[in-house]
């Protein structure tokens, strides 16, 4: 029996139902195919879905590539992903968050690939067997910090001077920044000049410099060069930055820090005027009082000299020390020695960080007429008891001997940090603000 439907058209011709069904099926198939094509095109334009749906390459293909090439490829992919995020410093509290372990993280450099790292910070080269400290990533609670992009950094620095001013911790941040960007600059297009106090890395292609000026107190002292090892003999000239500030003038970006040199546990010998008479005229002051006077002198220089329309000013908060393992519940431990993981307790605050000193910084900056951006590294660094140089460092220009490493109570450095390492995160935050 054939099923026919009447044709309402001219001539009254009838069309078999089977043909109509076949035509409708073909039409629906075409619609589905077209829709799927549009869907595929849409998904390919979305970096978030396309990257996360990529299948991993076969292991043999990955292992056959040079590590530096793999590191570069991963960095480029992550840069594309991070383009989806906009960092708003007004909305993002970088101090509140947690360290997340990510086994896929590869540093943008190593202490062997970057020739500018002091041996003091070259933990891997100095025999550090652990690498997990390189795999922790800082994740704020309410925002995302873009990954460090060397190309973006150098484009932002094109035609500019970036100058770090401060102590050896600030020097490690400077070395970190240089190492993060130097690999994208051709060999003949970069140079490094070092003196006792002043260090300049130049990227000719970008007409940019990344500089460091050694000033552990920011204000002048009798222990800059040469360093006086006995804290009792150190004198701080709390009323002047004149001699050193001439090196700072004209910089487009200034990043200051000063803290650990003030924390000797002794009262500070403060001087007004000339060093010509030695300790004569020096007055012993409480640390916080001397610190405030020194920072006010710095603030006065910034307010009177820096043109905020041309120069941006940053201040990095104190880098914590971890010399008392009882702080994190290990009374029988040996400072930061043999620590392999960050502290998880978000409320942790060790004895190596002085909140009153932090309040001094906040108070001084609050009353400045020039805007100063504070890079708060303290809380996130508090958790990183695992990232110090520990016994994988040098002292007196020499790598620690086996005997010295076996005595971490006297030789473990729980003040400075390995490179690559934690200072890379500081620079990730700095770049996000630029």
Curated annotation (Swiss-Prot):
It is a single-pass type II membrane protein. Keywords: Golgi apparatus, Membrane, Signal-anchor, Transmembrane, Transmembrane helix. A motif (GDS motif) lies at residues 166-168. Disruption phenotype: Reduction in inflorescence stem elongation. It is found in: Golgi apparatus membrane. InterPro entries: TBL, TBL_C, TBL_N. It holds the Pfam family PMR5N. One of its GO terms (molecular function) is xylan O-acetyltransferase activity. A motif (DCXHWCLPGXXDXWN motif) lies at residues 413-427. The chain crosses the membrane at residues 15-35. One of its GO terms (biological process) is plant-type cell wall modification. One of its GO terms (cellular component) is Golgi apparatus. Belongs to the PC-esterase family. TBL subfamily. Contains 2 motifs that are conserved in esterases, but it is unlikely that this protein belongs to the catalytically active pectin esterases. Involved in secondary cell wall cellulose deposition. Required for normal stem development. May act as a bridging protein that binds pectin and other cell wall polysaccharides. Probably involved in maintaining esterification of pectins. May be involved in the specific O-acetylation of cell wall polymers. This is Protein trichome birefringence-like 3. The lineage of its organism: Eukaryota, Viridiplantae, Streptophyta, Embryophyta, Tracheophyta.
């Amino acid at each position: 029996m054939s099923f026919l439907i009447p044709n309402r058209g001219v001539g009254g011709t009838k069309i078999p139902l089977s043909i109509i069904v076949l035509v409708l099926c073909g039409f629906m198939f075409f619609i589905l195919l077209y829709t799927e094509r549009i869907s595929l095109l849409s998904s390919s334009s979305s970096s978030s879905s396309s990257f996360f749906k990529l299948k991993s390459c076969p292991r043999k293909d990955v292992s056959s590539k040079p590590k530096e090439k793999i590191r570069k490829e991963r960095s480029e992919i992550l840069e594309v992903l991070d383009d989806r995020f906009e960092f708003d410093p007004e909305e993002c509290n970088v101090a509140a968050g947690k360290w997340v372990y990510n086994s896929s993280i590869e540093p943008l450099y190593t202490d062997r690939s970057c020739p500018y790292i002091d041996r003091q910070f070259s933990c891997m080269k100095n025999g550090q067997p652990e690498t997990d400290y390189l795999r922790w990533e800082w994740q704020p609670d309410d925002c995302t910090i873009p990954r460090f992009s060397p190309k973006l950094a150098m484009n932002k620095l094109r035609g500019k001077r970036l100058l770090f001013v401060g102590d050896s911790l600030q020097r490690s941040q400077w070395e970190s920044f240089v190492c993060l960007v130097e690999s994208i600059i051709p060999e003949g297009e970069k140079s490094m000049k070092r003196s006792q106090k002043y260090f300049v890395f130049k990227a000719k292609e970008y007409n940019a410099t990344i500089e460091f000026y050694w000033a552990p107190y920011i204000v002048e002292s009798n222990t800059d060069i040469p360093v006086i090892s006995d804290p009792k003999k150190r004198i701080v000239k709390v009323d002047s930055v004149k001699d050193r500030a001439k090196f700072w003038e004209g910089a487009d970006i200034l990043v200051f820090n000063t803290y650990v040199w003030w924390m000797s546990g002794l009262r500070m010998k403060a001087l007004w005027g000339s060093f010509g008479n030695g300790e004569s005229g020096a007055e012993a002051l409480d640390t916080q009082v001397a610190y405030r006077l020194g920072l006010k002198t710095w603030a006065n220089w910034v307010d009177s000299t820096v043109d905020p329309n041309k120069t941006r000013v940053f201040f990095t908060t104190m880098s914590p020390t971890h010399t008392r393992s009882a702080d994190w519940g290990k009374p029988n431990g040996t400072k930061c020695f043999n620590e392999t993981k960050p502290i998880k307790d978000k409320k942790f605050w060790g004895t190596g960080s002085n909140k009153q000193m932090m309040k001094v910084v906040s108070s001084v900056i609050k009353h400045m007429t020039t805007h100063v951006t504070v890079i708060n590294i303290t809380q996130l660094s508090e958790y990183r008891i695992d990232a110090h140089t520990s016994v994988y460092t040098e002292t007196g220009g020499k790598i620690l001997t086996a005997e010295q490493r076996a005595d971490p109570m006297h030789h473990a450095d729980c003040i400075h940090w390995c490179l690559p390492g934690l200072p890379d995160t500081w620079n990730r935050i700095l770049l996000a603000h630029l």
